[in-house]
Amino acid sequence: MAETKLQLFVKASEDGESVGHCPSCQRLFMVLLLKGVPFTLTTVDTRRSPDVLKDFAPGSQLPILLYDSDAKTDTLQIEDFLEETLGPPDFPSLAPRYRESNTAGNDVFHKFSAFIKNPVPAQDEALYQQLLRALARLDSYLRAPLEHELAGEPQLRESRRRFLDGDRLTLADCSLLPKLHIVDTVCAHFRQAPIPAELRGVRRYLDSAMQEKEFKYTCPHSAEILAAYRPAVHPR
């Protein structure tokens, strides 16, 4: 493994250097940091340097993983490849232990997109309620004790875990957290509607993520996220 070269190409920010708005890019960036494997991160400004990928991944969308000289361009396949190739005992497994962790919150981003990009003001409230219901389902999952928690505390009524599957980040978190952060950031700015404090499980989840370098370090600046959504959001 020491001789293998890993290079992750991600979207650059507006300044052309730091990490830009791209939840799939952040997802794989988090996975590699959690694996603890040496890799090179390359930010790509496709506006200023559109040909930078042409030699090994022509026409591909970011993110792209270069494993030695082999280019991989599908985010899900890259994630599966990293989990299979960089596994125990040399690297930690990031697979969740509970199947439900993989699907928790999987409808939140779709509901958010429908709400935030809605051109018809009269539909805003109905679409916002749909988003809140999706967030409430995620909140219920995050607050329900998991099997291993109940094994230690049979009387536990509400989970105290930090992430979807327990107290460590998994692939499920790498997928959901970048999108959930976008939801909170964009709704707060453009609709003055951050994820409600009453959704204690979701707020705890986001707060816990911000304490982890693998999430905090890979996050684009809020200005990057807002700039990406500004053209799609209709003023109210």
From Swiss-Prot:
Question: What is the activity-regulation note?
Answer: Inhibited by rapamycin, amphotericin B and IAA-94.
Q: Name one GO cellular component term.
A: plasma membrane
User: What PROSITE patterns is this protein classified in?
Assistant: GST_CTER, GST_NTER
Enzyme type, top EC level: oxidoreductase
Report the Gene3D superfamilies cross-referenced here.
Answer: 1.20.1050.10, Glutaredoxin
**Annotated disulfide bonds:** C22-C25
Single GO MF descriptor:
protein-disulfide reductase (glutathione) activity
Give residue ranges for domain GST C-terminal.
68-235
The UniProt entry lists membrane topology as:
Single-pass membrane protein
What are the boundaries of the region Required for insertion into the membrane?
Answer: 1-88
What EC number(s) has UniProt assigned to this enzyme? Answer: 1.8.-.-
The record's Gene Ontology biological-process terms are:
chloride transport; positive regulation of sprouting angiogenesis; signal transduction
Activity response to pH changes? Optimally active at acidic pH.
Tissues of expression: Detected in placenta (at protein level). Widely expressed. High expression is found in placenta followed by lung and heart. Low expression in skeletal muscle, kidney and pancreas.
User: Phosphoserine-modified residues are where?
Assistant: S49, S159
| Record key words, sorted | Cell membrane, Chloride, Chloride channel, Cytoplasm, Disulfide bond, Extracellular matrix, Ion channel, Ion transport, Membrane, Nucleus, Oxidoreductase, Phosphoprotein, Secreted, Transmembrane, Transmembrane helix, Transport, Voltage-gated channel
Q: What is its main location?
A: nucleus
Indicate whether Transmembrane appears among the record's keywords. Answer: yes
State which residue ranges cross the membrane: 24-44
Q: What is known of its domains?
A: The active G-site contains a dithiol Cys-X-X-Cys motif which mediates glutathione-dependent redox catalysis.
Q: What else is known?
A: Overexpression of CLIC3 is associated with cancer pathology; it positively correlates with pancreatic, ovarian and breast cancer prognosis and negatively with gastric cancer prognosis.
Query: What the protein does?
Result: In the soluble state, catalyzes glutaredoxin-like thiol disulfide exchange reactions with reduced glutathione as electron donor. Reduced in a glutathione-dependent way and secreted into the extracellular matrix where it activates TGM2 and promotes blood vessel growth during tissue remodeling as occurs in tumorigenesis. Can reduce specific cysteines in TGM2 and regulate cofactor binding. Can insert into membranes and form outwardly rectifying chloride ion channels. May participate in cellular growth control.
Q: How does it assemble?
A: Associated with the C-terminal of MAPK15.
Q: Which PANTHER family match?
A: CHLORIDE INTRACELLULAR CHANNEL 3, CHLORIDE INTRACELLULAR CHANNEL PROTEIN 6-RELATED
What is the name attached to this protein's record? Answer: Chloride intracellular channel protein 3
